[in-house]
Amino acid sequence: VEFTVENSKLTIHQLDVQSNDSVDAFANQAPERIDLLVNNAGVADGRWRNLNEIDDGWALEVIDINALGPVRVVKALYGKMSHDSLTNVAMISSLMASIDDCHMGRSYAYRASKTALNMFTVAMKKEAIEDNISFVILHPGWVKTDMGGDRAPVEIPDSVSGMRQVLTTRTLENTGQFVQFDGEILPWQIVSVRVIAGGPFPDTGMTV
């Protein structure tokens, strides 16, 4: 890949999010203070793959890249993001991670990987609040990219400018939200119920 760098402040480093050694090497080259981290690396699994087409090895690789990759990066850079002012961490996810919005099914590995990324992020925010780090899970929209295809309704500049605007609204109070590029808060799932085996079902007296 070739880049034309017009801004001398921009530096480009190679990074393999599946490799702890690569992530650590990148972290060692990174500035001592980081105020914004955008985890954008990801792969698709073939959008319309059905149940019979699931390949175990490829599914695990998709999950490793899309879910664990960003966690590796956050771990490696955490010390440089924890300082006296707010640091924003953006996890690029997808509406396809929403359990409530899984109307068409398929894309098993991609959906599962992004749902796992969302849960990793919500769990990490609990620890990061005390270190002045705010997380946001971003859905960039269905964008006209190599992955999104020509039928996608959202242009790249619109998606990017929208996500930049969302980042300006981040605080420790709204950390961990699942937000679309236009600012809409997205659903996690239809209902959240905690069931404890052998105990009473809350507010019903039922035992399960």
For each feature predicted by the language model, list its residue ranges.
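Rossmann-fold cofactor-recognition segment
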Residues: V5-D21
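Conserved Rossmann-fold cofactor-binding substructure of NAD(P)-dependent oxidoreductases
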Residues: Q18-R33
